[in-house]
Amino acid sequence: MLVTCAIGGVALADPVTITDVAGRSVEVDAPVKTMILGEGRLIYAVAALEDGDPFARVVGWRDDLGKADPATYAVYQAKYPQIDAIPTFGGIKDGTFDIEQAITIGPDIVVMNLEAKGATEDAGLIEKLAAVGIPLVYIDFRDAPIANTTQSLEILGTLLDKEARAKELIDFRDSEIAKVTDRLREANPEKPLVFLERAAGYSEECCMSFGNENFGLMVEMAGGINMAKDIIPGTFGTVNPEQIIASDPDAVIVTGAEWDAYVPGGAWVGLGPNSDPEKAHEKLANLMKRPAFTGVKAAETNNVHGVWHQFYNSPYQFIVIQQMAKWLHPDLFADLDPEATFKELHARFLPVDYDEGYFVSLSED
C-alpha cells in the first residue's frame, strides 16, 4: 500500500505515511503547500498533475531546467514569468546543494531524484532536514523509469492532493504503451539491432549509451534489441567505437537537447520544443561521419534518428516508445501517431501548448 492515512479527511493537511521509491516510510502532512524540487526537471511531472499554476507550491528548485532544457524553460517562463524568482539550488551530487538555504526556506517537503540517494546520505541531508521537521522523499524517472514512474506519480499525487489526476495520467500512459507492446506481442516481428547513443556529440569521446534500463529498456519495449544491454551492466555507461562497428546495428537512435549552457556550439543535436529541424538534421547527419559509424549498416541506410534527451528523465517515456516503435517497425505501426499522443498529453494534462521539435530522422531523406 502506497499511503496509510493516520487521520481521515482529504481537504486539510493530515499526516500520511508514504513509501517512497527507495522503500523508505516517510510521514508527511499532505497535501503539501510548499516544496523544494531537488531537480528542476521534476517539474515535468508536477506540471502534469497540477491543474493550475505548476509552480504555485515550488519554493525552491535545482537550477538544471534552464541549463539542461532551456527550450522547455522558455515555454513555461513565457506563461509563468515568476519562475525566474524561484530560489535555485545546486546539485546534491556535486556538493553545491545549500542545506542551510533549504532549512531557511522551510518547505513542507523536499522531493529528490533517486539517483541522488547516495550523495544525499553522504551529506546527512535527511537527518539535517528531519531535525527541523522537513521530510524528504525520493521519486524516480531516470534510474528505473519503467518500473518506478507509476509509484512516483502516485507519490506526487498524494503530496499534491491530486490522486485522481495521477491515476488518470498513469492509465493514459499504460494504455499508450500497450498500443505498442500488445501489437508486438501479437505480430512477433523480427527485432532490429539498435545502438542508442546518449547525448551524442556532447563530448568528443564516443560513445555514451544505456544498459538494460531507461532508453535501453524502452527500445526493447519498442521492438528493438539494445546493442549495449550486455556491454553496460547498469543504467548508464559507454561502448567503444570498435564495438559499434563489430555489432553493425540496423538502426541508430541518439538523444539530444539544447546544451549551449554546458557545451557551447557543441556537436549535440538540439531537440525540444521549437527546435530548428534543419539544424537538427544537419547535426545528426554529421554525427554519422565519425569513425565509429564507418560502414555501419544503420548509417549506410540512413536508419538514424534523434530524440529529445529529456524523455529519459520524465513521465513522458510512452511518447518515445511509440516513436521508436514506428521507426523500427514502420509497416506494423503505420497507423500510430506519436505526435498526436504527445499533443493529447499536453491538451489533457499540461498547462502549456504543444510545440514540435522533439524528433528528427535521416530516414526521411
What does each model-found stretch correspond to?
Residues 1-5:
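Sec-dependent N-terminal signal peptides of Gram-positive bacterial secreted proteins and lipoproteins
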Residues 12-365:
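N-terminal ligand-binding lobe of clamshell/alpha-beta domains
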